[in-house]
């Protein structure tokens, strides 16, 4: 488990139900939002964002 911060140039980071860009969006996290990284695999982080568990692309999270 690691702490991270959302780092997007525009809009929000989509938190998805599965590690796929076609998966359903379960939450959206704004730039600078704190996020907890639970696991990482194949370019995706499994995260807890405000109590919602889902997947985000690892390129848009800066680990702290």
Located regions from the model:
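SH3-family beta-barrel domains
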Residues: 1-14, 27-31, 38-41, 58, ...
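Short, compositionally biased
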Residues: 48-59
């Amino acid at each position: 488990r690691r702490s991270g911060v959302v780092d997007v140039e525009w809009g929000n980071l989509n938190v998805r139900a599965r590690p796929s860009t076609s998966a359903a969006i379960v939450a959206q996290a704004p730039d600078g939002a704190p996020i907890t990284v639970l696991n990482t695999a194949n370019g995706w982080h499994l995260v807890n964002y405000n109590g919602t568990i889902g997947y985000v692309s690892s390129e848009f999270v800066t680990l702290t």
